[in-house]
Structure formats: C-alpha cells, structure tokens
Amino acid sequence: MYMAQKAKKKSKLRHAEYYDMQKTFDSLYADSKSGEVFGHLMDIISAPSNIKLAFRNIKGNDGSHTAGTDGRTIESLAVMPEDKFVKLIQKQFRRYEPKAVKRVEIPKPNGKMRPLGIPCIIDRIVQQCILQVMEPICEAKFYEHSYGFRPCRSAENAISYAYGLAQRNKLHYVVDVDVKGFFDNVDHRKLLKQIWTLGIRDTKLIQIIKAMLKAPIEMPDGETVLLSKGTPQGGILSPLLANIVLNELDWWIASQWDEMVRHMKHPCKMTYYPNGAEKKCNSYTALKKSNLKEMRIVRYADDFKIFCRTKEDAEKTYYAVKDWLWKRLKLEVSDEKSKVTNLRKRD
C-alpha cells in the first residue's frame, strides 16, 4: 500500500514536470510560506498546461472509469481533440454550474455503510485543476504533524511519530476524539473564511468552490437533495478541504505546547541519549513546571489523537477540544465513541 502511494506521487511529479507546471507550484509554495496572498489564481488554474495536467492525473485513477450522474467517463473526454477539450474546461470556469453528485454507499469493515459522492467527470477535472494550484499554497501553511491526504506523507509516518511520543516523550495518555459525521457536517461559511485566511483571495475561485459545496446530490433512490453543509467524501477536492478545516485545530493544539517549546526565550539545542530519548534542557524543564499542559496532536484526515502526560491533563484536554470544535467549527463530538486511553495499561 505504502509503495503504491509513493509510486503514484512520483508519477504525479513527473506529469507536473512534463507539463512545465512544477516551477509554478514551487513558486506558489514559496510565496505562501513567506506570507503572500493570492488574488489572481484563476489565470493559473485555467491555463492549458494545468488543464492538461489535470486530465493526465485523473486518467491515472481507477475512479475515472466510474460515471457520474451524466453517464460519462474519462473515455468520453479522451477522444476529444486536445484544444477542444481545453476550451471545454475553460468554459466551465467562466460560469461554473456543477452537475448533481451521485451518492453511492459502500460497506465499511464494521458492517455499516459509508456514503460517497461521485461528481461528473468534467466536474472532477475542474476540481483537479483547482487542487493542483491550491495544494502548494495550503501545504505551506499546514501543521507538520497532520499526515492524511498530503504529498509525501502516509499513515506509516503518523504511526511512527505517535510511537515516538509514547516511547521517547513518555506521553502515555491518549485522547481519542470522534467527530460525528465530519465530512457531512463541515460548515460552508466557516470553510470559505478559512480558505481566505490561508491567503487564497481570488473571489472567482471562492465562488466556484462555494458552488461545488452546494452541488445537488442525487440519492440512491433517485431523489435529488440540496445540502446546506458538508463536503462529500469522494470529491477530489474534499480531502484538501477537510485538512483546511482541521488545520485550525492542529495549530490551536500546537500553540498550547509545541510552539511554546519552539519559541522559548532561551531556546536550547536538543540532544539525545544513545537510546534516542531527548535530553531536556533547563528551559524545557521550566516549561514543564509551568501551568501549561504538555500535549501533542497527530492527525490523519478527521482521525486524530492527542497525547498527554497525565490522566488529569488528558481528561481536561478532551473537554477543551470538544468545546473548541463546537464553538469554532460547529462540529459535534461523540462521547460514546471518544475516550482517554492509558497506553501503559494492558487489557
């Protein structure tokens, strides 16, 4: 699985270089890192090279052969002359109206069903064009320990970091928070504000994303519904939008401890014992004795765990996070599925 993901990412990099877009993406990342804002992204998004790259990336996905509500697949676009195809997609950007998203349900390992939204193939191309340009801008602002659906990151990386927190940092109490129906409950207005805050300020692009979020959903029984919240799982842009929503949580948790360690008045160079454990300097020790709770977050999409030093800290953290998620993001936490676990305690 991991090797397949690496091969797929390398393939996308080769495609970007082939269509001469990689330098543009690198520049977007660097500008975002330095605090630039972006008011004219549609010129890049609708550029022929970016559209051709989007087609190439979509074509490599198994899902490209699955039809949306219009019955079309990637094959129907592949037979078009290249210049005609590019003009078709550019026309979508001028006045974008997404077609209905096809809702299907697939079984989960626990026997329940997971709803997936399948956009029409042209809408998938449009989303891919946007993803390619938004991703480097967002990557420059994302927290380093979120691992889901990000370039050059994997579940294995998340597990490795979590293992280190428990073994080297001795953070043995884990807060496991379950958000009720995360993808179905994303607040559209809040999400659009978060996109703006990340420096993406092209109003035309914001309007297109807003239209995507409000695309009608064709249910399995044939009924068409309009949703006022949520971003359907299955959409190409949905994983990035999910990371944008929860990036604010990542940095809020980090501000409680991680960033304090990083920006101490007298920071010290970390050194290590032969077994890999960190040697803590005096400044770090003083920070531990303060009223701040030591906590670290590890997140993979909407699945996240917060590592704490004591049971009391973990329980306080759970209620603080639950309160924060509701007040800031309008997301509810399931008390039944959430828990605090002592990793040293064997079943």
Describe these PLM feature segments.
Residues 104-112, 134, 225:
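Residues forming anionic-ligand binding surfaces in small-molecule and nucleic-acid pockets
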Residues 1-83:
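Non-catalytic, polymerase-adjacent accessory regions of viral genome-replication enzymes
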Residues 35-38, 48, 133, 228-233:
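Charged structural interfaces that engage phosphate-rich ligands
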